[in-house]
């Protein structure tokens, strides 16, 4: 299912990696098919760097989307929603719309309200780095990773096929989920881990002893890694997935309270059971990821 003219709005880590991967996939495709890539970004340095992979680069959203068959929105979540509100004015004849946002309910709700001339589906690649920007983008970022697709009221069989093929072209594995279930799941495995890492990092930084950092090793580094994630992106994620995130923070606090009570009461048997069950859950998770 081939789409010739693609416009990527936002050339950060995700949008940049998608653009690089699509350019590479199209270059290696047999037979070769026409492919035109437009990049829209507000950062002058990013636009300058994008010239090596794009056929057209602009900071003008209207100009960027005017001839696109498929528009891919790769900005922070609330910006994606704002762009979706603008699209009917900028493209009254409609087009295919896809996004890479990390929370889906607000985005898919905005997609539902697009005119009939549009076809739209939500997307979320389950991968990333703790660094942001086009300079961190790589064409293999999505390879062998789960890529969630969230159908909307504006999703047609044609668009679902296009989105599925795009995900496969990126080297990822598509998984279809409804938006609300997606948001609940990623609150557990993505948004809560960020909050845990952020709280740990803030706590350690406030200890106030410069000898702490030489003492820290791989455990602290691995646990705190995602605290380096782009704050603007995380702000949008946390505010647009507020209910699910707060629920998971509460569940996590309960876990900490439970184990704190076991330590406080010196309940060795129960504490060992808690630790053993945790270890078993971890290895079950690792096996499930290995099995794919």
Where are the model-predicted features located?
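Residues at the starts of beta-strands that form the adenosine-phosphate
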Residues: 5, 34-36, 119, 146, ...
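Short glycine-/small-residue-rich Rossmann-like dinucleotide-binding loops
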Residues: 75-77, 101-102, 125, 200
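NAD(P)+-binding Rossmann beta1-loop-alpha1 motif at the extreme N-terminus of oxidoreductases
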Residues: 1-65, 70
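Rossmann-like NAD(P)(H) cofactor-binding subdomain of soluble oxidoreductases
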Residues: 83-135
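Rossmann-like NAD(P)-binding element
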Residues: 61-91, 96-98
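Internal alpha-helical scaffold of NAD(P)-dependent oxidoreductase catalytic cores
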Residues: 139-225
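Interdomain hinge/lid region at the active-site interface
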Residues: 209-279
